[in-house]
């Protein structure tokens, strides 16, 4: 196993990051959450104290098996849940204390796909991202239409504008959902398993777009994913969770270590350097020989 490599500060950006990258956008300090308490009054923690910071232009991937606390943490970052200890701050504002419209102008949460309640065309769906800026239920001001159009252009979906949402392919729909989030003009993008149901080509296209959005528009992007190797290739930092605890946070080459990953994912693993210089995780069979990495791509 080899985990050697250069530091990934600013990795994925083709060199040193711009000076403003050092500006902290998201600050999480000793944040924890419990969904309920036992009969004796003891809290049952879904997430223990977690601390990390993320800056402009950065992509941070949150990794961990099922029930590790990933979705709970994402809701804390979005301000949907309030931590029972510590804090979550976006641009120095407490996320859970922001009025809903103000919060929606700072953070956009892209959750796993849900069914539409009624038919919508793509432009109507993306226009919903402008709701935090309006005073009426329906928004069709010139500014709103312009921002919705810009959001579609950012994800390469301008040609989909008049299509019905239920007629889109998985990859097309994922781009449009991302466009609706961008129409909010947030500084922080939160995505829950955005590559789910996409083929490998669709996954790579989506992650390249996220990388470009972070680089060119100063977004901070937080991605919950189970795709270890894709996360390694596109992320600046990795947060590894297990059973509600944060085990490691740092560049992929600091986190992708066999002794850390094997107990978390309960599988025999090898870690090697890919041609890109990023860590690559491979399963080992019963004889210790590496399997194809198709199951961890």
Regions found by a protein language model. Give the residues of each.
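The feature captures the beta-strand-to-loop junction immediately N-terminal to the Walker
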Residues: 63-65
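Helix-to-loop junction immediately C-terminal to a conserved catalytic motif
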Residues: 78
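Conserved ABC transporter NBD signature motif
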Residues: 86-94, 103
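Conserved ABC ATPase signature
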Residues: 164-168, 172
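Conserved catalytic motifs of ABC-family nucleotide-binding domains
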Residues: 185
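Catalytic Walker B motif of ABC-type/P-loop ATPase nucleotide-binding domains
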Residues: 189-193
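ABC ATPase nucleotide-binding domains
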Residues: 264-297
